[in-house]
Amino acid sequence: MEGVGEIVIVSNIAITKPPTLRDSRVRFLVAPNLSISEARNLGIASSTGEVIAFTDDDCVVDGHWVSSAIPLFEDPNVAVVGGPGITHPTDTPLCKCAGAALESIAGTYSSSSRYASRGSGIREAGEQNLSTCNIFLRRSTLQTVGYFDRTIYPCEENELIWRIKARGYRVLYVPNCIVFHHRRPIIRPFLSQISSYAKGRATLTRKYPRSLRLTTVASCMLVLMILALPFTYLTTKTIFYILATVMVAYLAITFSASLRSCITGRLSPRYQPLVWLTILLMHLCYGGAFLVTLARNSIRPRGIGPTFPFSNNPPAPATP
């Protein structure tokens, strides 16, 4: 891949037989029992480049991935560049249903740009628009603001971008900076992932209350509204009819969005009911997990193994 000086692969699980490395630029590091955020920090500390690109082990990068992002760092104020993680074309239909739900604006609102290419030009981005499966970071900025916070996963990239933007650096979204991301199949594996996203967002909200987004509030309100329907039916019919009307409107909007998402995602219309159901369950799962996590008295770090603060030096990896 042109423009790539080195490739550092970090495995946070023990590997008995390391893979065969066919490129001299590739290094494989094994650091068992590190959290995902700690493993990312180890990758940063073990690399040498000024611009560090991140992707995941379930992604395939586009051939123009690097060239679409690196030139933007000629602006010294640009600290982060990223783009969408598009559903991999070889995914199974059940995985593509999950992808269609994520790509739908009615499904993930402004965060849909993480899962589908939005717009035609480069633009300023917020923490909700980018993901670590497709992100480029400037090393000197990380040395100023710190690395990934090990106590947060997922949403560790959201927390980092929040700190970066608070320092006045630019964060850019590039629609043609693409990786192809394998989705988890519906229903249980996908909803488990959504639940973890909500827990990470709740942890981020506890740390930065201003990071609470209206879209998160909407998912929480949906859960509370459904819980309130039986009670209001028995006590206050006027409120019940108002809530029921809102629910009907919500169902109509998500139904239409699921059909459109199937068409734009090149998914057969016969999967539309599944996509619609996935959007509904995704909202309920996200809102419920967020409320439960936020209501707990304390949120313990998800990282395991040795303490690895995001601002300190990492432990030495085992190199096979």
Give the label of every model feature segment.
Residues 31-47, 68, 133:
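Glycine-rich, basic loop-to-helix element that forms the pyrophosphate-binding segment
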Residues 52:
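Short aromatic/hydrophobic "clamp" motif used to bind/position activated sugar donors
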Residues 63-104:
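Conserved donor NDP-sugar-binding/catalytic core segment of glycosyltransferases
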Residues 48-49, 131-145:
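Conserved nucleotide-sugar donor-binding
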Residues 1-34:
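Acidic donor-binding segment of Leloir-type glycosyltransferases
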Residues 83-84, 89, 101-128, 132, ...:
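Short, flexible, basic/aromatic active-site loop/helix in glycosyltransferases
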Residues 149-212:
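Catalytic donor/gating beta->alpha subdomain of glycosyltransferases that bind UDP-sugars
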Residues 222-299:
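Membrane-embedded multi-pass helical conduit in multi-pass membrane proteins
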